[in-house]
Every structure is written in structure tokens, then in C-alpha cells.
Amino acid sequence: MGAMDDRRYSYPPPRTSYVQPSTHPSPTASDYRYRSPVLPQHPPTHHSPSSYSASLYGQPKEDPAIAYARMREEMRTAEEARREAEALEYRRKRDMEFAARRPGSELMDDPRRIPHSSFPRSQMYGPSADQSRVMPSRNGKDYISEPPSPSELYPTDEDTERLPIDRYRRDIDVPPLPRQLPPPPSEIGRMADRARSPSAPIAPPLLKVVRKRTKVIRPNDFLVGNEDVWEDGLIRYQSKREDEVRAIAQWAASCQVRNGVGEPSLPQTQDESIKVRKINGDIATPTNKKKRKSRKLNLDDELLGLASSPPGSPNAAAEAEKSESKHHIYGMNGPIDPANPPSPSTIVYPSGLTRAEVIAKCEAGDVEGLTEDDVKAVQDEMWMREKAAQAAENGGVLPTNKDGTVRRKPGPAKGWRKIRGIDKKKETTPGKAQSTTAGSVAGSVADEEAEADIAALLDDSIAKKGKKVKRRKLEEPGAESPRFADAEDEYNEHRPSDSVLLDEIEDEHSRAGSVGESNALDTLPAASAPPKKKNSKTKEPGVGKGRWTRPTKPEKELVKKAEALASRTSKASLAGPSDDTFGVGPGPAEEVQEEIKHEYAPNTHDPRGVSENEAKIRHELVEDLQKQAWSNIVRDVPRIYRVFQGYDQSMKQIAQRRAQACVRNAFGQRNQKTMQRQSGKVNKEGAAKAKRIVKELAAFWRKNEKDEVIARKKAEREALERAKAEEEARETKRQSRKLNFLLTQTELYSHFIGKKIKTKEAEAAEGMDVEEEEKRGMEEIAIGEDGEPLPDLDYDEDDEENLRKHAARGAQAAIQAARDKARAFDDSIVGRGAPLPGDDTMDGDELNFQNPSLGENSVTITQPKMLMAQLKEYQLKGLTWLGNLYEQGINGILADEMGLGKTIQSISLLAYLAEHHNLWGPFLVIAPASTLHNWQQELARFVPRLKALPYWGSPKDRETLRKIWSRKNQTFSEDSPFHILITSYQLAVQDEKYLQGMKWQYMILDEAQAIKSSSSARWKSLLSLHCRNRLLLTGTPIQNSMHELWALLHFIMPQLFDSHEEFAEWFSKDIESSSGGVTGNLKPEQLKRLHMILKPFMLRRVKKHVQKELGDKIEIDLLVDLSQRQREIYKALRQRVSITDLLATAENNTDNGNPKNMRSLVNLVMQFRKVCNHPDLFERADVVSPFVFGEFSQSGNLAREGDGMYLPDSARNAIEVQIPRILWTDGGKLDIPGEQSLAGSDTKILQNLLNIWTPEWINERTKCADAEFGFVKLVGSSPGETSRSAKSPVLVQLLEGAEKERRWTEEGRFVDDSEFAASVKKGFRVPSVIPVLTQPGQVSLREISRRVWDESYLSRDDARCIGDYAIAPIVKPIASNRSFLNAQDRILNQPLAHSTLYGLAPSELHDPLAAEQFSRIAPSVPLTGLIPSSASSQTPVSPLHIPPTKRLIVDSAKLARLDSLLRELKAGGHRVLLYFQMTKMMDLIEEYLIFRQYKYLRLDGSSPIAERRDMVTSWQTNPDIFVFCLSTRAGGLGINLTAADTVIFYDHDWNPSSDAQAMDRAHRVGQTKQVTVYRLVARGTIEERILQMARGKKDIQDVVVGTKSVSDVAKPSEIVSLFMDDEELAESVAKRKQAEAHGYIAPTIIPNGRRSQFGDGLVLDDGEGDDGFFNAAAAARANAEEEEGLGAEEESKGKGKAKAAAAVTFPVPGEKRSHKKGMGKKAQAAAAAAALERVIAGNEEPLAASKPPAKKKVKIALGPDGLPL
């Protein structure tokens, strides 16, 4: 592309073409822009490399590389010659064009002239652009390589005088003035405009006007570069600009007034001078100086003339030439070389003074007229002089850097702040003499250039984006305001391009060129630049990174006003002379001044002199050139590719020939075949040996690397293990210290609180041993009275004393916090106007940790008088304990065993507070939904003076109730509308925001195990309620783990029990492992400390210690064997369980295992539990029937109705036939009257004429031969009897026939015709009355056969086969007519036939009148009908098969045992509570109870609250109810069922606390009978092991609460052991010993990727019995639903998910599976048994299974009998 760009300039100028004229501001001129057509492109003259191939071939001895290099050199030389020729041709053409367009003629008269205005030159067009671009030249000189001389740039006087008056001014008569000072070109342009107007007289060619202050454009604004794009328009524009520049330069040079010595007219800036010196090599370019990157310009902006360039000297070329020729006179600013300092006569720019003069002015403090660059140029030399003087005084040592160089002065110029102060003094002092050059144009330019750096802008227009420009606030309020660039508004930016030069000079301030002075800006108040807040981080104007900056928006507004004021001031200055300028003569000059004041139209062109249309044209030209370039590239690429392809082929041929020549020269004429035969054998052996050596080396190094890796890994592993062991030892020691600290702190707190509230005395009872507390003196606490600060607590140190002091202080803080909280609550109650409680016994202030012996000050409470009951001794102690809790302001847990009266004790506490402390509320009681009514009844019964408000029901009802208790600022007294609010847990969570608005005196949580999960929303919501004290009532404080105990303890004392991790570190792991039979490290002293910590907060008594009159509780386990059907299904499940998969699942389901695997395992457990309960839970033996094509209506319960139920009309065919109307109503039926019918004609026509069954017709036809009624004579019937029989119904015919046969049998003669008698059917035959003669005492044969048939299975209804696979009712016609429906019903349902078949109705059987009437209608038919009286074999087979009810009992062993047990209990007068885990099992039991006709009640999670209350009341009051069916979770909480004396658990819970609560519903206070508890357990199944696991959990509770010591309790370590019975375990152990005797070692099973998990094939439908043991979240949701009556417990949530367990699939283990070659099935079983034994024994962790082969999925299909097929 570079060659193509250079080549474009060598072509002759093409023909130009006009385009659309652009808008011009002058109304009389039309402006045409020229655009260049597409230039023709010559193909490049590349020399193909193939042209040199011939010469290469002719010189075989010459190196091809040398030839190719020579070829490339020749090509490069030819290309350079061509470029030089093109450049010379271009320069010649440009000289001719410039000569043809002189400014004297064409510039003035051309109507298409481009408006003149000064704009900065683009960077891309300047000398700093790409140097390969050919620049225009003039007079044979290139501006880049050879700068023009001053004579070429500065016009002569003759050229100046030839400048015409501006054509935009009207002509005026101006007398010639003395030529003292030439006018600026702007004034000349205005005069020329007036001279061209038709009415104006001829004006002299030159008008000399002098302005006091003005600004000039830069002389170096050439628009050069890419002239072939813009063509003639750009050429004329450039010619005009060059002429204007010459005129301005000459005029400015002649305006030098009072110049200083050696002061140049237009000095260079410091940057330009340094740049020239760097080019000339005078100074070295520093390498460590970071230069700021300039902003890159867009090519489109450059071509459109919208790019700006940094300012430069107006005559940069001339000054560059002068600098080059006279460098010794006009030296450049730059760094000082201490070894070779600059001459004092060197000129300093931009001031133009010598270095000596500048230094003298700076030292004298007179820096007027100097800029920052001037001061910077000499500051180093001044600093060195000063340091040299100091060094002379100190011994001649200059300050140097570390590298030995002389240190320079850093920072800005020394006199810069002085300059700012002097400028201010200069501007503010009236009458002070101005600068010597202030009155001249050149002086103005020089001053403006000097002030440009001083008034540099605050914002840098080319600064990096995002870089913050630091600014400095002016020190004095009257300081000089900064100048801003680009501050013109849109009006000034779009002024006409042909406006006078004065306006252009005024607009100069708004561009990125030279910025001069502005009196308007100087006279603005200092407020125009608002002061910054931080002076230390701001910079003064002109000290920024860029030379010119851009002002902010507020500053732009000020500059706009300043520019307008400056314009008016500048114009006004032309009206009269001043002291520093030559005056203008009177007369016409005044008119000129008036014209100068004229306001011109706004500018509408681009600021650079390019209009919008011209910019569009330029943009189109750019696009055309780009398209042309790309088209040339696309055209030339294939050709160049072919050229280089040919060159490549030629080079390949040369290389090939050269190789062939080398081969020929190397071997010569020797016989190559002989050498090959001799070397073949050697090469073959050498190759083999080399391969073997390489293989051995590779093997050696592989082994070596492997050994190194193994050794390195071993060393790293050992180092890691050592580091881990050390870290574990440190962490163990640290945790031990932390545990000791926490225990000490809690012990001190518990010790004091326990003595205050007397927990020990409350627990003491007859027959109960209470351990003496260890005396602990307060001297051990070591808390100083002075309160000196203790050292920081560090658990890594061994300072036990410091730990104990911190623990004591922490306990004291906790006590103080409890005291402050209670006091604050009481103060808030008093502040609301509540009555002061009688706090005679309250000693909150005495709660001092330093005085622990306050036992004598504790409160002794008697029974309240308002309590309408007599408390027992242990209950009164419990009331005293609760009262002391309130007195001390702490919370507690009343954990008495279920049935000891926790409710009455809490009620008595509320009565005590109301009676002794005058605290009538508000109290909040939260209980499960099933006990809400019980609480309401107990409060109304025992404390009628306390008003209880039940808060439950619909949202609307609760909103009404809230109006009662949620009043603001209400006080509570005996007359208050309520005292106690009773609600459930679910409603408390829902209405939390309302309950938080009240401050409750006491909050009582009944059955507090409902908040055992600290992560539940219920726990968090209740913890946030505002209450003074909390009391938790629970019979089982320990549920599943110690985590639940921590949740309760944190709820009552969050200050101490604030971290569950710490609590678990204390006790959880040790106690749980100890109760599980695993060796734990729970020490007796730790257990003792745990009891001591829990004792003050928890009061627990058991029944055997405190209630002597309460009857005993006997628990009996009833072990049953599975039925045949259960055994088959259980065996089928076991066969599909692999022991290997069992162990793998156990290994994967650790605490951090996969939850999906855990869910699969638990689901498999639930399948086994279903089998043990009842096989119908898998698939119910449903009613079986053929496919019926029809619809059925709703019917009753088929199981209850029995086999005699028959609904013939319940079925209806899906096909319906619509009868046309004409067939029934419009004459179709002869017996239906109508308008067009023939009613009455049926008697004549149908009954007589068309009836063949009339007696006359029969009699007539019997006389004819071959007549159809010939049989009448044979059967012995008369024509009348035959006619009557034909017209009678079928049933009447059958009855008459049966009666005739009976008479004939009884009265007729004997006929010896065996064949005829055998062929007669015996259906519906009436038993014979003829006596059968038999031997006396013998049974007749008929009776024997009947009895055998009745006792056989084939006689049963369920054994009779169904003949059809599909049946369909009859298709009934349909007509929309009432009479049609009545007739149809009368025909289908004949009363006579119905009565004969089914007999009389049950209500008419004993009615003599109905019996007599029935005998007349149907003689010899029993009153019960033919079907009930006939044998079962004669009745029609029913298509509906209903399973017998007895099968429901027989198929389940547990239900069969329950059936016999209930018979015994019913006979003994007992009443039974029957508990279940599954609601579907409760449905089956309901059918059984209905079958046995036992009266029962059912309560589960779906029972509403109101029904629960009614059911409990009915059970307690109605002794006729024998069985109460309950779910363990819904019916085992807080209800009193003491009317029962027997409890039966059909299946038991994972959680032993749930079963304990359930059985205590009957064994509680008020029970006078002995309570017997039965558990139905299937022997040898998973249920037996689940029961053992639950009892192991019960031991945790006993260990924690102190009723049992640490001991080994039998518990399986893994759930896997649940699936193996004792026999299998013993057999596995024997096989393991046998395998070990043969040398077998059990393999290590390593997990490999994703295995087929245990129970993957099962349908994850654990709705039946997922009681939440493994899923705490599901259990919590189930509890919530049960409590609120929102649905059944967790097992009911699975309804509808899985229809039957017959579709459950299981993985089938592969037949070919062995972990070791030659290992058989017995060895595998022995190995698995050995591993399982080690797991159960706790000596080894369970091993994972290797990845088994793919398994098939099989489906268990159950047959009609319920057994697997």
C-alpha cells in the first residue's frame, strides 16, 4: 500500500468534475467544490524471479543465494529510481500549479474562493507525520527536507500593498494615511469587501489601521498533504492561506515597536526548541524520562479537517532555518551540562531574552514578561550558582547524587508564585506602565505566547482518559483567572467563514492554537475560578501535563461572557488612538471604526473553514479511495500469487537439480549395488541392536523415574503425616484448654444459680439419691476487686490461672446480663403505667457473684389460694423451683417424666405470680395443636380467675381476637379482658410480627421438643419474642442427639450456650459413641461436670421416685413369625440385595456421605418394614372384574354389603341410540294418541288381523295339513291354553311349567325311559316330596354328595371362573319423551319377575297380607325368592370378584396376632390404645375393626383440632369404645388418655422418645390401673434390629439426665447390620474362618467412580413410614402438619405416588463376580462376612466395594394370591 500511495502522485492531473454546490454564507457567491475522479492504476513493475533463472542456469558455478540477493538489490534500486522520478514529477507539477494561481488575481476575483480563517494544521499533514508521504514543494524546495527561507515566507512591501480590500465590506472614502504602521490583514479584508460593492466608491488599495490589542493567526497553518484528494479546491485554499500568512508575517515584522535586544518577532516555544536541538544532535535524549502519549487521531477526522494539532510557532520553518544557521546566537532551552554550561548570551524562549538577562530578572525578583519555560530554562544554573557559593563557603563540595552526578533542583520554577503575585499587582495597580510591546501587533503576539504558558488550562484536552488532573487553588482572591481553550459557544463556533480577520483573531482563543491575552478575562473577578478544597493536591494553571486544557462546563459559561466582552472592547479600542499606538486621521476613519463595530451574522461553517457539505464530500472521497484501494488489492492478489508460485516452483527445480548433481559427484562410477549388498547385513544387525539398546535404556529410565517418584511421594507423605500429627496434637491441646475454660465458666455460673433456685432440693425426694455438690470456695475464682485488666486469653498458652480468671469474669458478666435484662423489663412495664409488683421477695440487686451464700434469701412458695386443686409434694417443690427461676430472672426446663403434672405446675406458677406479685399478665402459652383445648380446659378448671384467650381459627377470626390483646399501652389487672394467650406453634410463627409487639411476662412452651432444631424457622421466631422469662415443658429433653439438647439450652440461656460446635466438642461425640457401644473417651469427671452444668437449668423427676400410688408399667414384646406370603416377598427382597453392595453403601453413607445413597438405603429399609406390617401395603388384593364397556353409577361399600348385593341397573352402555320422533309420537306407535296417529287401530289390526296366537287361528290351522300349529295336539294342549301361554310373560310360563311338572311328578304314572329322563334339565327344580326309602340310621346319598360339595373349595364363589373377558350392558334406545321412558322402565324392570327372583323386601317378609298376595302371584315360590333359595351352583356367576375379608387377617402375621390379642382384651374388659406409623396401615386396620364389629376411634395428623378434642372427650367418657387408633406423632403429644390400660404398638418409631410419650398418654397421673404395653415385632427381621437401635438411643437420654451411668449398650454400628440376622452372621463367621484356613486374605475394596448404589432400583417412594429419622427436615414438616391438622404425618405425604410395590425393581448381582482369580461364591461370601464382622465389632471401618459389573433390572410380579411369581 505504501508503494501504491507514492505512485499516485506521479500521474498527471485528471479531468475535474463538478459536484453539488455547497452552501456558502455569502448570498452573491456560489461555491463549488472539486472532487477527484478515480485515478487509473498501473500494475506494479515487479520483476519476476523466474526472469533470472536463465542466467542462473547458464552459470552453474554461481551460488543461487548470491544471485537472488543481487536480483533483490536490482529490484530495490529500480524501485527507488522510480520513486525519485515520481517525486520530481510531482514537485514540478505543484510548482506549475502554484505559479498559475497567484493571490493577486485569482484569489480576489474567484467567486468560488474558500473563506479564509486560521486553523491548526493536522498532525497527519505536518512534518511529524509519516515521512514516506511526499509533501508539496514550492520553488523546487521540499518543506520537510529543506526549510523555506524567510524571504519566501515573509512577503515584501510590494506584495503587501497589492493586497486588496476585503470584498465583504462596502467601499468608503478613506484618505491616504501616513504609512507608519501597516494594517492587519483582517482590516484589509474588510476594506476589500466594501470596495467590491457596486455603490461604493473606489477605495485606495491599502488601509492602515492600528489596533491597541489584537490576536493573530499562526503563520504555520498550512493545509498540506493528500492534495490529490481535494484537488483544485484545496489548492486554491492553500494558496490563499500561504499568501495571508506571508502578509501577516511581513506586517507583524514591521510592527516591532520597542523590541528588546535580540528579541525575535515570533519566538519559538521551549518544546519546539528542544526538539530542534535533539534533531541537530546538540543534546542527548534522556532515556528514563517518561513521555506522555499523544492522542491518536482518526483517519476520517484527519481527512475531513476535524483533527487539531498542538500549537507551534507561527513561522516554524523560518525559525528552524535560523536556529540551524545561527545556533550560537539563538540557543535553545534545554538541560544544563555542568561541565559545559551554556553561554550567557544564549537566547531563552519564548521570552527572547538572553540567559544573563533572565537570570538577572529572576534574581532581582522582576519576572514580569517571563513565562514558566523561561524560568525553568535558567533555574538549574541559578541553583548551581547558589550551591557553588555555599560550597565555596563550606569547602568546595557540591551536592551530588549517589552516582556522583551533581544534583539538580527538582520541582517547578522557583519564581513561579512570584510571577503570579506580580501579575496580580500589575493588573490591580492603576496607572502602571504596560509592556514595551503591548502596543504592537507583534508585541501582542509575543505577550500572548508568553501568557499562554502562564494561563495554561486546568483540564488537558489530550490527557489520558480517566487520569485526574491535579489543580492548585489560587493563593489570593484577586489573583489572575486562568485562560481556557475551546470555550466558545455554538454561536461563535459557527460564524461565517468570510467574516473579517478581527473576528477570526477573537475566535482564536477558542481553538487549540496559540492562546493569547484577553482583557476581559483579566478583568473578571477571581470568583470565576472557584477555589478548590484541597490546596496541597492542586496545580496552578499551566502546570498540568498538557499544554492546553479544556475547561469545565461552569467555566465555559464564564469564558463565553468574557469573550463577548473582549470582542466589544477590542472593537471599541479601534475608535481612537492610545498612547502606545499611532492614531488614525479624522474623517473616513471614524466611518471605518463604525463599520468595525458592526455585528456580523453568526458563523454557520465548520471551525476549520470546512463547511458541512464539503466535509461530506471529503468523506465520500475517502470512501471512494478506500474502495479503489481494495479493488486494486483484489485485482492484484491473484497475479502476485501466480508470480510467487512460479518463483517457488523454479526454486524447487533448482534445488532438485542441485541434489542430483551432488549425488552424481559423490558416488561417481562406483557400483552402488555391491555396496548395498555388503552393507545390508551390517545395517540390519545394527538396527536390531540399536532397537534393543533403546528399549533397555527406556525401561531402565522408566523404572528409575518410577522409583524416584515413589520415593519422593513416600517422603512427602511421611512429612505430611508428621506435620498433620503435630497439628492435631496442638489442636487437641488447644481444644482441651478451651473446653476447660468453657466448663469452668459455666460451672461457676451454674454453681451460683443452683444455690439460688435450689434445684438440688427440688430434685430431692424419698428414695432418690442426690449426690452432694462439691464445695467450691470463691477464693478459687481469683477475681480481683480492683478490676485490673487481665492478660489476653490465649488457648495456646499453658496459663491455667489466666484461663480461670477469664472464665470467672465471663460468668460474672453473664449473671449481670441476666439481672440487667430482668430489671430493664420490669422498668419498661412500670414506665407504661403498669402496677408495681409486690417485690418483697425479689432480690435482683443481691445477684452478686462475689456473695454466693444466698440460700437463706431464696423464696419459699406455698400453694396459691386461687388454685382449685391440691398439689402433691413433688409438685410443690417444682413450683418453688419455678418461682426461684422467676425471682432470679433466668429461664429453665421442666423435664419431669410424662404424666407427673407439668401442666398443673406451670399453671400454679402463673397463679403464684398473680397472687403474690400482682402480675396478671400478659402470659403466653404455646402448645401443640392437639393439646390447645386441654390447656384451655385445665386453666378454666384450676384457675378460673385467670382469663384464658384461645388464639386459633381462620385468619379472620384471629384478626378479631387480635383487637382484644394487641392494644397499645394497656395495663393488666384482675379485671383485664384476658391474662393468658393460648396458641399453637404454627400460628405463633405465622403471626410472629403481632406477637412481637407485646412484652410478655412469661412464655411457656409445652412439648418443647418441637423447637429441637436450631435451624428451623420456628426456633428462630420464638427466640425473637420479647419476654421476661421462658419456661420449657418437655418429658424427653433428649431426642435424637445432643444437638437437640443444645437447641433447648441455647433457647433458655443464649449467653452461655452460644456455640453448638463447642457444645458438641464438650459432650456430644463422647456420649453418643459411648451409648453406641463404641469405645469413647468420655471420662467420669466430664460426665459429672455435664450434670452439674445442666442441673440449675433443668428439673427432672421420674415416676418411680415421686409417685408411689401410680401403677406399674409392664412392657411385653410379642414376637411373631411371618406368614407364607410375607416370607416369600421378604425372601425375594433379600435375594436382590448383594452383601458387597451392602458394605459399599454403608461405607458411602457416613456422616459426610452422599445423601442420595442414604435416601436409597432408608427407602430399602421402609420396603422391608412394609413387608413386616402387611403385604397389602405393596399391592392390595383389589376387586377383579372383566372389562365392562359402559358406565357405572356410584354404589355403596361392596365389602360391607356382602355377596347378595346386586345392582342390575347401575351399568349403562356407552352406545346410545336416538329414536326418531316419528317412530314414537308421530304415528309410529298405534297405541299412542296424537294428531296424525292411528291410536285404537292396534286392537283391530295388531291384536286381531295380524296376530297368529288367537285361539280361532290356532284351531283353524290345526285342521290343515302341514300347518305350523300341528304340535298342539302332540303336547296335549288346547288352542286356548296355547294362546294364553304365548301371551303370558316368560317367568309366568316357567312357573306354570314348573307347577305342571310337579303335579305330573307327584300324580303321574311311572315312565321307564332312562334316556328321556336323563336328557331333561333339572334347573330351578323344586325338591321332590316323594320319600326315599333307606335303611334306618343311614344318611341318604343326596345328602352326602351335597355335604361334600359344600365343603369343597370348588363350591366357593371365588373359585368359580369368569367366562367372559369383556361384558357390556344392553343398548337402550333414547327418546325425549316421558311416556317412552316409563314404558321402557316397565318392560325392563317387571315387578312380577323381580319379586319372583329376589322375593319380598326385608320389610315385607313378616307381613301376612304381602305374603298371601305374593303366593297368589307366584305360587310355590318361597317368599325369599328363587335366587336366594336355590343352591349356589344354580345361581349365575357374578362377573365381580371381591376378595374375602378373612384373607386380610391371614396374610399378615402381626394382624393375625393382633386379632387374637384383641379378642382376649375384649373378653377381659380392657381398653386399648393402638399406635401406628403408617396411615395406610390404619386404613387396613379400619376394615378389620369393621369386620370384627369393634367400636373404635381414629386420630391422625389429618384430624381437625375440634374433632381431636371431641374424640378425646368421647374416649374418656364412653366406655363402649374399645379401640383408639392413633398415629405415634399426632396422638402421642400432650393428651390425657388415662381411660385406657393397654397400649399396643403395631410398629415402633426410630425415635424412642416418641414411643415413650405415646405410652405415657395412659400411664400418667390419674391412672389407677396397671398399664400393659405390647409391641408386635416380626422375629428375625429388620424390625427387631430397629427396636434395638431405638433402645440404644434411649440410653443417651439416661446418661445425660443422670438416670444411667456410662456403660456399653448393644447397638449396631451401621444400618447395614439391620439386614442380616444372627444365623447369617454366624454362618458368615464360620465361612470366614474356613477361608482363612485355606490361606485366603480378604481383598481391599477400593471405590472406583460411580457405583451401582444399594437400592438404586427401588422407587423412591418412602411416603409410607419415612418417620424422619434420617431426614430431620421432613420430620419437622411432618410434626408441623400433625400439630395443625393440615394433613397426615410424613407417611401420608406419599399417597398417590406409587401404586404398588410389585413394580419395584432391584439390582441383580452378577453371576461372575470375583475379586481374585479362582475365587468361588463361597469364598466371596466368607470374605464379605469377615468384613461385616469387623465392621460390626467396631475394629475396622467398612470397606467400599469395587465397581460391580452391569446389573439387570428385574421386576417382581405378584400373583393373585399375593406371592411372587
From Swiss-Prot:
The keyword Transcription applies. It holds the Pfam family DBINO. Its main location: nucleus. Belongs to the SNF2/RAD54 helicase family. ATP binds at D896, E897, M898, G899, L900, G901, K902, T903. Keywords: Activator, ATP-binding, Coiled coil, DNA damage, DNA repair, DNA-binding, Hydrolase, Nucleotide-binding, Nucleus, Transcription, Transcription regulation. Residues 175-186 have a biased composition (Pro residues). It catalyses: ATP + H2O = ADP + phosphate + H(+). Residues 629-759 form the DBINO domain. One of its GO terms (molecular function) is DNA binding. Signal peptide: none annotated. Residues 304-318 have a biased composition (Low complexity). It comes from Cryptococcus neoformans var. neoformans serotype D (strain B-3501A). Residues 407-419 have a biased composition (Basic residues). Residues 1457-1607 form the Helicase C-terminal domain. Residues 17-29 have a biased composition (Polar residues). One of its GO terms (cellular component) is Ino80 complex. Residues 883-1055 form the Helicase ATP-binding domain. The DBINO region is involved in binding to DNA. It is found in: Nucleus. CDD domains: DEXQc_INO80 (cd18002), SF2_C_SNF (cd18793). Residues 101-113, 161-173, 420-429, 552-563 have a biased composition (Basic and acidic residues). Residues 1-66, 101-200, 303-342, 390-446, 458-588, 1680-1700, 1740-1765 are annotated as: Disordered. Residues 702-745 form a coiled coil. GO terms for biological process: DNA repair; DNA-templated transcription; regulation of macromolecule metabolic process. This is Chromatin-remodeling ATPase INO80.
